Every structure is written in C-alpha cells, then in structure tokens.
Amino acid sequence: CTKVETYEDTPTGNFEALWHIIDTKYCFLDYKAEEYGLNWNTVYRRYKRKIDDGMSHAGLFDVLGEMLDELRDGHVNLYAAHDVARYWDFREGYAANFSEEVQAHYLGTDYKIASALRSTILPDNIGYIYVPSVSSSIGEGNLDECLAALALCRGLIIDVRGNGGGNLHYAETLAARFTNERVLTGYICHKTGTGHSDFSEPQALYLESSNRIRWQKEVCVLTDRSSYS
C-alpha cells in the first residue's frame, strides 16, 4: 500500500500540501538548482513565514502564487475563482517580434482553412501554411487536402510564429508529412518516485514517416520567441 499524506484545509495545510506536491512530483528541481540555484527547502522556509491561519483566501493565493514563481516555469499555474497565478516573464520581459499585420498582408483574406491550418499560395508560386496553434485537431484528411492544393508550388513556408503549443500528437502528425524515414526526435524519462532524482532510464522518441501525402520539395519553417510548448 501507499501512504497518502493528508493536510488540514487551512492556510497552513494548503501551503504544506502545495509545497510537498512540488517537492515530490515536479520533475525539474535538480535542473533548476543547477541552472539558477533554486533550493526548494529554502523556498519552504521563506514562504512559510508568510503563512498565517487567519489570512484571507486571496492573501493565501497570492503567497502560493509567489512561491510557484520561484520555479520560473510557464507551465505551472495556480487556479482560483478570482484569478490565475502564472509565470509569464519568459514572454512579457521581451519585445514582441511577430507582426500580425505583416503576416495578414501575406496571408490575405482569400485563404483556405483546414482545421488549425491556414494556407494560401504566395507570389512566385510559394506555398504558405500558417499554424497558429496545435491545441486543436490537425487531421490526416486536413493535411491531405492542404498539401494536395499546394502540390504544384516550388517551395513551402510553414509559419509557426506565435504558436503557443498544445497537443504533441497534432505536431507529430504535421511533421510526419515532411520526412521519408523514421527520425529520432528526443528522449523521455518518467518520474518513478518522490525523490528529486527518481527517474526511469531515458526512452527514445521517434517520428514515423507518414504513409500518406508527403512534401518532397524545399520547405522553410518560420519560428519566433513565441513558438514553444
């Protein structure tokens, strides 16, 4: 059997619960310690002093949000009915470098929409596909139709600027149309215990080539600081 820690529904109890969840389940504590000196035990002592069982829900929310900010992780959020505590310094601390006006000029208004794909043919017979997100479905049929319509183009631009990510499966479905062979894309480890270094052995991740329409000509991928996740 597995022992499950229980905590009182008080500011102190909720603080303890959240700190321990991060301490035992968050994957990157050792990496953050090496990268910028994060010490999660020091974080505990620093923020424990700010907790009082008489504080308001909003006050507790603010302290817990500040504590999570120490992780410097845009994927770590705390939700409440009145607000979402988030870490957005990775993008708010930098000037925007993607102009929707310029992009709209090239995409125009007479473009095709196939699920998450926006496509058109630019001057000089260059195909253009804008992928603003991979949060919504990119189906095999969508890709068949899109690539077939651009088949006579002499080259292709895939624009993922401003793409805030989403579902890895949809990204792989798109990428599989641009390789004729199996490609090693990375490695993954799974958390196996409560210790900061408790991970499985790395497992290789491969992208399989699609058995449907694949692009065989030149292709250019446009990215920017907002292409992530």
Residue ranges and their predicted role:
Residues C1-L207, E218:
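Flexible, low-complexity junctional segments that flank or bridge functional domains
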Residues R212-W215:
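Short, conserved loop/helix-junction motifs that constitute active-site signature segments
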Residues S226-S229:
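Short, intrinsically disordered, charge-balanced linker/junction segments flanking boundaries
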